């Protein structure tokens, strides 16, 4: 029996994610937190969580450090997600999100992360060379802590190509700019990230579509542009599609993009068509927005929303 395709998620800046629900949150006041959630976080770890929920073999890697790093690794073990990380001299960061259901706001305070030393960067590159042989897909998600070279993701993309692995890039800033030049298999930018690549904000949906096409012209096979509540655009050799998410009772947007990416990878592995892959992704992003905690949506919640995703082909 042929083994099921497996995914390696890379999180350079893993975190202890704390999400608090505070009604009527505002500045210069003291609040007592009545409900909250503390979990292992970071964009790649969120991706791994949803892939695991959907039954896809997955492993998480990246940097961890200190007591926070130990908490992250232990939390992953408790969730049944294997991890193989490089340990750093510094302490993994803490990210705090305050959700106010009264005002419909979400305030985030994210630590910058520990200083990564050159030998630690080399250690992760060496680990990735060994791990890549065991996987079919690699995701490069999120930010990098201080000390990580701007071209780190670009190096891994080239490494993956040499190993015959499909690399998905979902990052920002210089990591994204260098990364797209290395030609990943898939890239998933939002509006702000497109602006970082092209030096200007896309002008509406048409502007985002044009930028996605330009990324495709570089040789990237699949480009998915996320537009938040306005939906998402898919551009690939199969064609171009736009999808609109269904209405849900909003709780938190933290992890919705990661849930979307994980569900799209799942759908690709299942051999689904491009529009169905996009539907799965958009449904997962919406399902995540309706739960407390990044990446804790269930298969049932995703499947319930798939028929409610409006998807149309873009005819040139």
Stretch-by-stretch model annotation:
Residues 52, 154-161, 213-216:
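Surface-exposed amphipathic alpha-helices with a cationic face
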């Amino acid at each position: 029996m042929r083994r099921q395709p497996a995914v390696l998620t890379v999180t350079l800046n893993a975190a202890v994610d704390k999400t608090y629900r505070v009604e009527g949150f505002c500045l210069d006041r003291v609040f007592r937190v009545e409900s909250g959630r503390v979990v292992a976080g970071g964009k790649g770890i969120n991706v791994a969580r949803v892939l695991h929920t959907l039954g896809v073999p997955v492993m998480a890697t990246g940097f961890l450090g200190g007591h926070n790093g130990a908490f992250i690794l232990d939390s992953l073990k408790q969730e049944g997600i294997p991890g193989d990380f490089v340990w750093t001299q510094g302490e993994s960061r803490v990210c705090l999100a305050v959700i106010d259901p009264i005002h419909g706001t979400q305030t985030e305070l994210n630590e910058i992360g520990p200083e990564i030393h050159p030998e630690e960067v080399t250690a992760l590159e060496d680990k990735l060379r060994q791990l890549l042989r065991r996987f079919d897909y690699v995701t490069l998600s999120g930010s990098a802590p201080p000390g990580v070279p701007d071209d780190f993701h670009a190096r891994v993309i080239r490494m993956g190509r040499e190993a015959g692995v499909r690399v998905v890039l979902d990052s920002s800033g210089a990591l994204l700019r260098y990364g797209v030049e290395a030609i990943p298999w898939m890239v998933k930018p939002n509006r702000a990230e497109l602006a970082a690549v092209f030096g200007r904000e896309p002008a509406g949906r048409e502007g985002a579509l044009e930028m996605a096409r330009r990324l495709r012209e570089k040789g990237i096979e699949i480009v998915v542009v996320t537009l938040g509540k306005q939906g998402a655009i898919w551009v690939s050799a199969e064609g171009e599609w736009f999808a609109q998410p269904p209405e849900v009772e909003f709780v938190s947007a933290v992890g919705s993009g990661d849930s979307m990416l994980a569900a799209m990878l799942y759908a690709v592995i299942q051999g689904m068509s491009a529009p169905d892959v996009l539907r799965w992704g958009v449904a997962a992003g919406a399902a995540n927005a309706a739960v407390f905690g990044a990446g804790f949506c269930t298969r049932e919640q995703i499947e319930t929303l798939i028929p409610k995703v409006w998807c149309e082909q873009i005819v040139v």
